[in-house]
Amino acid sequence: LDPARPEGTQIALHVVVIPALARQKQPDPVFFFAGGPGQSAVGLAGTAQMLMQRLAQRRDLVLIDQRGTGHSAPLQCDVPAPDEALARALDRSREVAALDACRAKLEKLPWGDLRFYTTTIAMADADAVRAALGAPQVDLVGISYGTRAALEYLRAYPQRVRRAVIDGVAPPDMVLPASDDVDAAAALDKLFADCAADKACAQAHPALAQRWQALLASLPRAVDVADPVTGQPTHVTMTSEAVRGLIHQPLYTPAQAAMLPYAIEEAAAGRFGVLLALASSIGDRPSDLSEGQHFSVVCSEDFPRLPAAPGPAGDTGAQGLYRAACAHWPRGAVPAAFYTIPVSPAPVLLLSGGLDPVTPPRHAERVARALGPKARSVVVANNGHGAMGIACMRDAVFRFVGAATDAEALAVDAGCAARMPRPPAFAPPLPARAVPATNDPDRFDDAPPGAPGADTPTPAAKDPR
């Protein structure tokens, strides 16, 4: 557990190696670093295989449950009961109390010294796995927080890296959650601007930005809603902090963000059901994320550098939550070098989505400059968080890793998704009109308005994409 005391408490790392399919495989395995922090790489095996299907033809795929996640000395908090999840999501004090109770429980575990779950220590574990596999070099693929892990591995073990792909770049000096608030505000402003510039969206949602500000100004407000998980009627208090937090996760995915104009209009009219359902329909289930590992990392690496007060972008509630939780969370030692990004001897491909609310291109572009001439930053303008979800980008990653030379890798064509449009704003279907009975043998009584044989066509509903 403590690298400085090898004779002390021992932990076991959960590692899965998915062998390459080819008979003559390449000697450099692909190490996949999951996001969060707190996700289990092994738990994402299906996703990892999908994202790297072509890479895995000729290279072993190595999935390591980072210490504190999955089955590697897990630091899992209790999952709230279905009828408690909404109350905790809307009330910071309940969430803080639950985290305090979780911390007390975790500290009683044999591996419960929460100081020893930092990214630096975890990457030493990863290099021990590399050595055990007998691989002179590895290729790295990191997503979201996994990009921070990959950058730390590259910093600490530069000669062990052949190629690196980091998607949704979260550099080590990016202070969570303060940067989240800045980037989420920018993504929301972009949504408002794009809606105003689109004729259909502007007609359906005029002055959307002003409606949003009016909504925030109208809060707090006590409302009756249907719990989006249980369906039971629930009385809750909606605060501006809670509403700002609810719109954050849908911004990750443009298809989900397309629902936000409608959800905001509904909330402004006092109907919060759409917004609550949208926020609960995506993202990780609580059981998928090791909250103990998450806070052990963030409280050690980010919290000491968190500004004393929220900046101009405000606080979605996360800053207050982390300040309260980290005030009592044990903090591990973080070397000063962790926050630096040296010039890379290995080619690095950095991927970003122009609509990403948490790791937008500004972070990748700064990291690429620091990494030097062997770094290449690619932005998919109308994508959100995670460019490798786009099939043609996965092909670009395959060609980058598989290229025979560094020069060929850095010259790979990665512009395939440049013309991908932003999904149009969601428009709810028009309500169906009753159709009177008829003796006309050429039509059915239940034919919809506008169907063949109908007496009077009506405008078709907008495509609800």
Write out the residue ranges for each language-model feature:
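A short structural micro-motif
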Residues: 214-218, 253, 266-270, 281-285, ...
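Long, low-complexity segments enriched in small/aliphatic residues
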Residues: 264-265, 272-302
